[in-house]
C-alpha cells in the first residue's frame, strides 16, 4: 500500500515563541520519501526532532519574527508493524484524562453496555457514539471534553474519539487517542480516532466512520487531544493563517465496519 500525505501550516507571530509541530508520520512507518521545512519571515529554520515512547515525532524550534510557514510531505510505501503494547499501557490508558472524563461517565457506560465485553463491546460503543452524536464542523470548542460533547450531541472527529475513549475506560477497557492522516476523508483535514486495548492488541475505534480505517496513517498517540495536537506554542500568541492537509492512497478500498482493524 502506497500512501502520500502533505501538510502546510502558516502562522502569524506576535513575538518569541517555541513552536512544536506534530505532523510527521510516526516512527517505524516505512518511508519512501519525506521532507519537513520551516521558514520564519522567509528564512529557513532547522527544527529539532524529538520522538516519544509511542513513536510520535515532534519537530520543535524557537522562533522570533512575524510569520512562520511549515511544509511537510511524506510517501509511505508499505505498512507499519502491529502496534506495540507497552508495560504501562493498561494503567495509563485506564485513567481519566483532560478530555476523557471516564469517572464522570461511569454511570452512563454501566447502564448502556451491561453484559458486553471484548470485541462485542467495541462494536457496541462505536454504534452507540455514532448514533448519539452528529458530525458538525466547527460545532465544538477546543476546551470541550467527552461530557460536554455528549450533552451537546454533536462534535467533530476528536469529540467522537474522546467520548468513545471515556466510555471504554469507564468499562475497564484501556483506550487512547491517535491523530492520523486519513485518505478518503471529506472534507480533508487531520483526523482523530480512538484505539482500544482488547485481547492484547490495539484496535481502531472510529465512531465517525468517515474514512476507511485500513488506510489510516498514524501521526501521534496519547491520552487525548492534549497529547496529540498538530501544533503547540509556548510563549507569544500565534494566529493560524492557513492550514492544508492532503492524504491519498493508491489502493482505495471500502471499509467493512463489521470487522476490527489496527493502525498500520
Locate the predicted segments by residue.
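Intrinsically disordered, low-complexity N-terminal segments that are enriched in acidic
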Residues: 1-79
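Secondary-structure boundary elements
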Residues: 13, 80, 84, 90-155, ...
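Short, charged, solvent-exposed linker or helix-capping segments at domain edges/interfaces
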Residues: 21, 82-88, 206
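Generic structural hydrophobic/aromatic packing signal, biased to beta-strands
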Residues: 21-23, 36-38, 72, 109, ...
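Short low-complexity stretches enriched in small and charged residues
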Residues: 23-32, 81-83, 148-153, 158-161, ...
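Glycine-rich loops and low-complexity Gly/Arg-rich segments
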Residues: 32-36, 45-48, 62-64, 95-100, ...
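Low-complexity, flexible helical/coil segments
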Residues: 42-49, 56-61, 104-113, 211-217, ...
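Hydrophobic/aromatic-rich core segments of domains that either
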Residues: 127, 159-237, 241
Amino acid at each position: 500500500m502506497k500512501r502520500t500525505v502533505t501538510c502546510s501550516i502558516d502562522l502569524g507571530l506576535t513575538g518569541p515563541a517555541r513552536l512544536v509541530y506534530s505532523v510527521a508520520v510516526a516512527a517505524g512507518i516505512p518511508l519512501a520519501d519525506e521532507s519537513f521545512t520551516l521558514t520564519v519571515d522567509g528564512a529557513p529554520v532547522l527544527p529539532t526532532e524529538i520522538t516519544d515512547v509511542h513513536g510520535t515525532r515532534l519537530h520543535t524550534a524557537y522562533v522570533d519574527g512575524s510569520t512562520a510557514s511549515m511544509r511537510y510531505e511524506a510517501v509511505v510505501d508499505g505498512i507499519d508493524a502491529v502496534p506495540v503494547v507497552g508495560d504501562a499501557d493498561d494503567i495509563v490508558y485506564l485513567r481519566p484524562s483532560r478530555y476523557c472524563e471516564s469517572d464522570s461517565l461511569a454511570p452512563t457506560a454501566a447502564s448502556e453496555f451491561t453484559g458486553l465485553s471484548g470485541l462485542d463491546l467495541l462494536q457496541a460503543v462505536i454504534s452507540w457514539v455514532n448514533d448519539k452524536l452528529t458530525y458538525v464542523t466547527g460545532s465544538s470548542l477546543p476546551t470541550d471534553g467527552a461530557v460536554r460533547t455528549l450533552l451537546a450531541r454533536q462534535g467533530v472527529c476528536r469529540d467522537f474519539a474522546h467520548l468513545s475513549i471515556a466510555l471504554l475506560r469507564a468499562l475497564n477497557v484501556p483506550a487512547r487517542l491517535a491523530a492520523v492522516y486519513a485518505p478518503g476523508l471529506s472534507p480533508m483535514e487531520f483526523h482523530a480516532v480512538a484505539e482500544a486495548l482488547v485481547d492484547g492488541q490495539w484496535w481502531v475505534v472510529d465512531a465517525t466512520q468517515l474514512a476507511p480505517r485500513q488506510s489510516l496513517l498514524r501521526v501521534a498517540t496519547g491520552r487525548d487531544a492534549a497529547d496529540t495536537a498538530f501544533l503547540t506554542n509556548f510563549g507569544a500568541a500565534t494566529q493560524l493563517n492557513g492550514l492544508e492537509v492532503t492524504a491519498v492512497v493508491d489502493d482505495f478500498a471500502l471499509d467493512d465496519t463489521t470487522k476490527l482493524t489496527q493502525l498500520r
